[in-house]
Amino acid sequence: MARSVAFGVAVSEEILGDGASVPIQGGIADGMATAAALGFDCVELHLRNPTEFDATALARLAAETGLRIAAIGTGLEYSLNGLSLTSDDPVIRERAAARMRQHIDLAAPLGAVVFLGLIRGKCGRRARLADCLDRLAEQLAPLAAYAAERRVPTGIEPVAYYFSDLLNTTAETIDFLRRPGLESIGLLLDTHHIHLEERDIEAGFRNCAGRVTHVHFSDSNRRYPGAGAVDFARVARALDAIGYRGAVSLEILPSPSGEEAARRGLARMRELWVPRAGTRAANAPTTAGSGL
């Protein structure tokens, strides 16, 4: 029986520094070659500007390295470009939405998930939280339709309180996605955030059955799995229980170095799945959440 999940790692074009949770930085081509040499099945690409990349060239690079491009991350649009779907400035909101469409366009021919984390923005004031969520839903509904038309799976990420005050728990996120026009959006689940925000990390994953489009493995201290307090065995059990068949990707700090963090993280993931399964994963993404 084939292993149920594909092992992935985050790669960026830019050098983001030691404080960024992307272990392989400084070039997509070189980063994918490194990921392949380390033994990963797939990568997620963290892109500041999707229009700088050609899908055909990326597909060729994937074929050359034997890797699948499992996902495209949009967080750099917020952290480096200052774009937010809930900004008070309507011009910034529209620029953020336009960039999301460009990420979706790039992902479509690659069969990649597009996930949404920090680009949701922050509200900043509890009294305005309902208005901020309404604004986010207003921006996401047309993007969900745009992604669904192009058959691009997507996921919004519940994030810890120190990242954003919008959608911290799985329950909040699932409830938000019940709004009209958002039903096709899936969830990206990150063990670091779930560990901080959920009373029971395994239950947090199980509650999202049928909606999970991508998974991040990151320990409680944002380092590689095994460097902190997250019980990854419980997470692996939960993912198997809900029938998740997508990528499990390392979005971790590059400590003690990017390659070493990735190597140690991959070793821990193999401990969790390979003894119970056996062979290299079939690189087939989950079909849940074909919209943003």
Each model region followed by its residue ranges:
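N-terminal pre-domain/capping segments
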Residues: M1-A108, A267-L292
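Acidic (Asp/Glu)-rich catalytic clusters
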Residues: M1-R3, M32-A37, E52-T74, Q102-G111, ...
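Hydrophobic faces of well-ordered beta-strands that scaffold small-molecule active sites
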Residues: V5-V11, V43-L45, I69-T74, V114-L116, ...
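Active-site beta-loop-alpha junctions enriched in small/polar residues
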Residues: A10-L16, H46-R48, T74-E77, I119-G121, ...
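Active-site acidic/histidine proton-transfer and metal-coordination neighborhood
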Residues: V22, G26-G27, L83-G186, T279-N283
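Acidic-and-aromatic substrate-binding clefts and catalytic sites of carbohydrate-active enzymes
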Residues: V22-I24, L45-A57, C123-R125, Y161-L167, ...
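Conserved, mostly hydrophobic/aromatic
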Residues: A35, V43, A62, A96, ...
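Acidic/histidine-rich catalytic cores of soluble enzymes
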Residues: C42-V43, A137-A236
